[in-house]
Every structure is written in C-alpha cells, then in structure tokens.
Amino acid sequence: AQIKLNSTFRKYSQIPTSKGLTGAQAAAEVARLGGANIVVRQIGGNLTDNFDPRNNTISLSQSVYGNTSIAAVGVAAHEAGHSIQNAQGYLPNKIRSALVPVTQVGSRASIPMIIIGLILPVQYSFIVDIGILLFGLVVLFQFVTLPVELNASRRALKVLDEGGILDGPELIGAQKVLWAAALTYLAASFTALMQLLRLLAISGSRRGNNR
C-alpha cells in the first residue's frame, strides 16, 4: 500500500493544475470554503502533512507546500478536510482525538509489557494482559482513524469540485492520490489487528501450557 501511495503521488506530482494554486494556497482555500479558520505552515520531510486541531494549524511537507501539482493540491486539501471536520464538530474525529493520549501510551508501553510478562513466571501473566489491552487501544485507534480519513478526503474532493479549484480530470487524479493514501491506513489497521490476534494466541497458549 505504501508503494502504491508513493508511485501514485509521484505520478500526479508531475502534473500541474490548471489554476496553478500551490498546496498551501489550496489548503487555505478549501478550509475557507468549508468554514474553517486555519494557519498553514511548512514542515520538513516527505508526506508528513498533518492537521493539528489544538491550534488549527495545517502543516504541509516540502513536496506539498509550494507545489502546484494535482498530488500536492489533493494532499493539502485532505488536511483542510480535517480542519473542516474539526470546525463542524464531526463526532468520529472527536472520538479519535480523545483516543490519542491513551494510544500514545499504548504504542510505547504495550510491547515492552508483553515481553516482560512473557519472561516472568506465569503468575505474572496479568502484565501480558495489560500489555495486550494497551495494544488493543492502538488497534481501536487505527480502525477509528480509517473512516475519519475517508471522510476528510470526501469533504476535500467535494470542496475542490464545487469550489472550482480542480477540473474533472484533475479531480480524478486527486481522488486516486487520496484513495492510495486510504489504502495505507487500511493496511495498517489490518496489520495491527493481525498482530493483536497473534498476541492473544500467544497469551492463551502460554496459559494452556501451564495448567
């Protein structure tokens, strides 16, 4: 999925839009048309673009911020889609934001706790259980993130179309870029789920062997 995203982004990053808006300008315009008041800034890295609801800031990577390509405008508009979600109080986005703190703890602590619990005698299996619970929160976050990302893309494409920012063929290109990005979230969600099931199987097998 990541390879698909990179190749699709690379393809449409070489095709400029007819309007000539940069990613930064497109993000600002999409957010404005969607009723969101935001600040756009540039950050380092490649495809590190994000929206921070705490300060209403859209951060765009170097390959997006000043680029006038279909890919850049599509990615920038997607982040603006998140700002519109935030401005309109989109419930799944609120749930996702509420999960962020516990997910951060879970992503850091779950695997070390599981490893420690497996090393210790079986009477310390509760440590494994806590680790698996924390990892389960990470998996939940992944699955909550997927519809939020898809909704942000739908909002972005709607504004790009209705606002006349992209024309028909350009809109199709932006849609392909955003769909490729969605596939990476889908792949990450199922990878995390498979890992959770594997951890549950290991924990269950350990208990069974010590009965």
Task: Annotate each language-model stretch with its function.
Residues G117, L134-T145:
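Alpha-helical transmembrane segments of multi-pass membrane proteins
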